[in-house]
Amino acid sequence: MKQIRNTIRRTLLVAGSLALGSALMGLPAVSSARTLDEIVASKKLVIGVNPTLPPLGIFNDKNEIDGFDVDIARKLGELLGVKTEIVQVGSPDRIPFVSSGKIDAVLGAMTITAERQKVIDFTVPLHTEVLGVLTTKAKPYKDWMELNDPAVRLVEVRGATPVKLVQEKLPKAQLLLLDNYPDAVRAIAQGRADAMIDVMDFMTEHTAKHKVDWRIVDAPIEVYFCGIGVQKGNDALREKLSAAVKEMHKSGYVDERWKKWFGGPMLHDPRTAPTYK
């Protein structure tokens, strides 16, 4: 099982590793990031947010960046006693921007990986992402490996990372590929598919549109821990932001904001991470 889990992790993170490698190829010359004292003196914390990862980051009706990450970023500024400036970043920009000192910290589904930890530092985990199985209460599945059956009809989004996992680990299952998540979820709701493997945290907005007794298989395939990225070696800032994240967890602020934006509780507690100290 350990070997399978390691294979899964390599399979799912290969795209991210390649993207990281590409990003690092284009990294600007590293300049010294602002220290915690400099941030406090300037009364401004500059945080990168990716608005193309709803509901972590979105553009609202006023064309302003909004979402879970923005709420967290503003709360971080409040806890540090400074204002927060939001800077738009894309997935390829996140690490280069924080590594070069263009921003003080970065949000945006920053999964804490060994590869990323070579070039930036992370706070304690802010939230998690759970790779799991979406199905209905009418289906008996208790473990994702039960899906490796010719009678099982899986649906996946064309080009999404789990497609390769399904093809390699669940070759006996039927596989329907559709172009987007609304269509994939609709296929299950209409009975054209039995289940889907993906990050479950982002499914609520799609499942809420269908009057179906949805169910997420209890045993997750993998859990990813996401933190806030800062420039390598900026220890005082990292420690201060980690303390702020812990305070937000303790006060219930993270849970409250997550429920607001995701429509339900976080599926896995980030405080269970070995790095949450």
Segments and roles (model prediction):
Residues 49-53, 87-92, 101, 105-113, ...:
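Beta->alpha turn/N-cap motifs
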Residues 59-61, 73-82, 144-149, 162-178, ...:
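Ligand-binding cleft/hinge of the Venus flytrap
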Residues 85-96, 141-142, 176-186, 190, ...:
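Short helix-initiation/N-cap motifs at beta->coil->alpha
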Residues 127-135, 200, 204-246, 264-277:
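Periplasmic-binding protein-like
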Residues 161-176, 216, 246-277:
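Ligand-binding clefts/hinges and TM-proximal coupling segments of bilobed small-molecule sensing domains
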Residues 93-96, 110-118, 165, 189-222:
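A ligand-binding cleft/hinge motif common to bilobed small-molecule-binding domains
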Residues 33-109, 118:
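Extracytoplasmic small-molecule ligand-binding "clamshell" domains
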Residues 135-153:
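Flexible hinge/capping segments at coil-to-helix
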